[in-house]
Amino acid sequence: MFCHLRPLRRFGLRKVLPHWLHYSRALSGAEAINALRPFYFAVHPDFFGQHPREREVNENSLKRLSVYLENLQKPGFKSLKPTQLTFYIREKTAQNSSEGQEPISTTGFRAVRFTLHSSDLLSTVLYILNSCSLPVEHVQSLNTNVHSQPLKEATGMPDRPIKWHRSYYSFTGFKDPDEDLTHVSRVETTLTSWLGSNGKGAVKKLRNSLPLRKELDRLKNELSELLQLSDIRWQRGWGVAHRCSQLHSLSRLAQQNPGPLQNVKGCTVVFTDRSGMSALGHVMLGTMDVHHHWTRLFESLPSYFDLQRRMSALEAQISNLLGGIQVVYIEELQPALTLDQYYSLLHTFYNQLLRSRVPPHPHPQSLSGLQMILSSDRYAPSLHELGHFDIPALSDPASLQSFMRTKAQQARENMTRREKLKVMENELIQASTKQFSLEKLYKEPSISSRQMVDCCKRLLEQSLPYLHGMHLCVSHFYSVMQDGDLCIPWNWKKGEAMK
């Protein structure tokens, strides 16, 4: 049941994982962000203004961490490749270096390296905090089903944290971390104060990035026209300079070896971590791969197109067996799968239906207009609040049909609400963009339509002159990106932050 904790033992963390972890409910995304606040405070790029190299390392690592946490929260998530991260941690008092950590430098920070490999959100949060030698007591308070011994007994920690007298900080010249946390709680979690403190810096970064942004648009348009592409996208939050570099690389390949690239006509190209074709049929170009790998991919596209046709036929056969319901892949809610992986999942489910000899649905089109997604987990089928059915590939077909018939009307109602919510979201994005004269307003994939609607409604009640001409991203935390984009949490606070 708890096999996902085994990798932690190799790192000597078995003793420091709280005993109550084994009796806890799943941690929500919002609770995970809240639990990681001490970590975000220790690594936030804004505190590394005098150290551009360390700042960039933290910015890039935070992006990769955000992607990892987002994938952990997707329904049907099974596993991720181990992700190695490096962060520079702000230090105020001397500590002994431990495994995976470098000694503290004279500049007031130390480097910490760790590898994420857990498929559980709670154990991932605890692993991050422990790797950075940060407290974990507050995580226990987030869990409502704790029925075991207190944290101090499970971890062997002292009864209370060490609290130094003010004279210690006066004598040593170090800052009291409690005062820093209090200041950040008041300023960073208040939208107007945070914008006031960071607006000018963001404007400067945005202005500096404008030439590269124009170059990016030019390259994207030229390549789209040259290769007759449907679109060019990026799966990660790379900066403008990195995106330009990737497009230049593709442009050079198109000039040096144009033949294989004729196969990409009409496709969407996505720059990501690995090369191949996605479950949606997008051509994925791994940014760490060389031109030789890209060329082989372009040459093999005809075989991928054939697999796409077989996949569509398989989806149609499944639909016919299950009353006309549409089998879909929703990128925002499912783990990132290649076309091969998704076809294998469909094939497993189809064989499950055939082996059970389930008779055709008594009303062939009774579920027409409804949608279902397939997952690789072993949980029971469920109906998502957005209206689609989340179906494990190894579900019992007989009980599955009964479940779908019972929930069909509720699914249609959920889908109707989803469509109305999407329309409202688009209207509020347009209204907010116009009211604040934003150059761009967008959200991270992990932000739901409901969260975006709530955020925009509250924004429209504010007077925010700092946003004029800016790029605003609705996310889970505050940050100024390297090219000047402002990230704010969807549930931002106004006035005094809640303690």
Curated annotation (Swiss-Prot):
InterPro entries found in the cross-reference section: DUF4460, DUF4461, TCAIM
Source organism superkingdom: Eukaryota
Entry coiled-coil feature ranges: 206-233
Tissue occurrence: Expressed in peripheral blood leukocytes, mainly in T-lymphocytes.
Statement: the UniProt record of this protein carries the keyword Membrane: no
Keywords of this entry: Coiled coil, Mitochondrion
Inducers of expression: Up-regulated during induction and maintenance of graft acceptance and down-regulated during graft rejection.
Subcellular localization(s) per the UniProt record: Mitochondrion
Keyword Transport (UniProt): no
Any Pfam family hit: DUF4460
Cellular-component GO terms for this entry: mitochondrion
Role according to the record: May regulate T-cell apoptosis.
PANTHER family, per database record: T-CELL ACTIVATION INHIBITOR, MITOCHONDRIAL
Protein name as catalogued: T-cell activation inhibitor, mitochondrial
Recorded name of the encoding gene: TCAIM
